[in-house]
Amino acid sequence: MAKDKDVRPIIKLKSTAGTGHTYVTRKNRRNDPDRLVLKKYDPRIRQHVEFREER
């Protein structure tokens, strides 16, 4: 069905604040080969914090 090395895999973004909150998104491996880091809202602490790609 799906290719093992998909160009746009589904990834989890985990909060660096240690709350355990995650977002699920897709990323393009050709444009972003490194681990993705985005600043997003963490509702558990009501602040914007960095979310890092989890493997």
Curated annotation (Swiss-Prot):
One annotated Gene Ontology cellular component of this protein: cytosolic large ribosomal subunit
A molecular function GO annotation: structural constituent of ribosome
Pfam family for this entry, one: Ribosomal_L33
Ribonucleoprotein found in the keyword field: yes
InterPro entries for the chain: Ribosomal_bL33, Ribosomal_bL33_CS, Ribosomal_bL33_sf, Ribosomal_zn-bd
Protein origin, superkingdom: Bacteria
GO biological process, one term: translation
Keyword NAD among record annotations: no
Keyword list, A-Z: Ribonucleoprotein, Ribosomal protein
Alphabetized PANTHER family for the sequence: 54S RIBOSOMAL PROTEIN L39, MITOCHONDRIAL, LARGE RIBOSOMAL SUBUNIT PROTEIN BL33M
Family statement drawn from the similarity comment of this UniProt entry: Belongs to the bacterial ribosomal protein bL33 family.
Name of this protein: Large ribosomal subunit protein bL33
Native source organism of the sequence: Renibacterium salmoninarum (strain ATCC 33209 / DSM 20767 / JCM 11484 / NBRC 15589 / NCIMB 2235)
Organismal lineage: Bacteria, Bacillati, Actinomycetota, Actinomycetes, Micrococcales
Gene symbol of the encoding locus: rpmG
